[in-house]
Amino acid sequence: MEQWQILTMQNWRFSFKFKDACKEDIQDHCEPKPKKKEDVIRCLVEAVATDTVEEQKHRISKDCRAQLKFELLQKHSNIKLDPALEAACHDDLQQFCAYDKGEDGGIECLKSQKPKTLKKECRKQLFQEEKEEANDNEVDFTLLRGCKREIKEHCSGEESRNILRCLKDFSVDNNFDQKCLKVLNKRVIQQSQDYRLNPFLKQACSQDVTKYCSDIINEFQNGGNGFEGRVVDCLKQTALKKLPLSESCHKEIILNMVDAAKLVEADPVLERSCPQSLLYCRSVYQTDKDISECLKIMFKKGGLQDGAECERHVAEIVEETGADIHADPVLHSACAVDLRKFCHDVAPGEGRMFACLVSVSKEKSFTLEHECNSVLTKRIEMFGVAVKVIALRKIKD
């Protein structure tokens, strides 16, 4: 059976259902006419993705889209059914995944590697697969298998590209399956590496990226290693500088800040800028929340073990609390009761919740919970240090 599947993946004419469903679509929308099935699929996928993102009428017929989804799901379930990926990543599979191939033959193992460690052609083919899964979560075999129960319970009515985001919304549930959470976190980390793998952010911030981050696009888009978090970091810095971002982009950047606050690896710039400080914090603490808090305390005490770039980035992480309190899980958790009590009528975002807590802490007639007051006091002190670091950096720049 696998041999026949491999044959049909190599030549689209051997895949009879696909041929019947998509023949006219291929003739109408794929010029010059591709011969390899991988090129046919890529052509159709790009057409479907463009129409979905731009919210316009689909050029590809419904029957062809359904068959295309089936073909993609097959391809993503086993590397042997993706000849182009298997060939491009042959050496990397041997080097990194010889003992960790799993049921999919090594696809997830390859995704776990840092982009720079993979050969350029392998990274290129793997990125194509990641894009397909980001634009249509129903072709993400590992996500569907690992989160089957959670998708059925929480996200069965969602559009295919919304499933991952829907799962993220419910992942705070204590009963959330750990196997599913592991896959979910892995996808969040992938998105953080390259903004093009986050279709919502890519769509919402397209004009903002052109306006503020075009130098990064020009420098890194042909490098083969993706953007390594640089585009999102550029947009975060733009937001922290109070420069005008489109409303939809600003919302996406806040969501990204929250992701990075909950999952340290979802901040590739932090990983790259603060390796020694992270090494120390990870040797002492286990959870992402505690590791992040460890970095902030080291920053406040002037004890970060890396250079100025690390100090600058941690200062921005501290400053992000002023942008949205959800970007600081420790403060948000410690002050949950007080936020409901004193700030329930304050609109979230733009530092309003943080400002509300600070205002309440100064009122003699109100008393914050002890833990909230303690964490808030530390944050105010950290914020003062962060403002000085960022101001000094601006002078040097």
Feature locations, PLM:
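Mature extracellular/luminal domains of secreted and GPI-anchored eukaryotic proteins, especially small
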Residues: 1-397
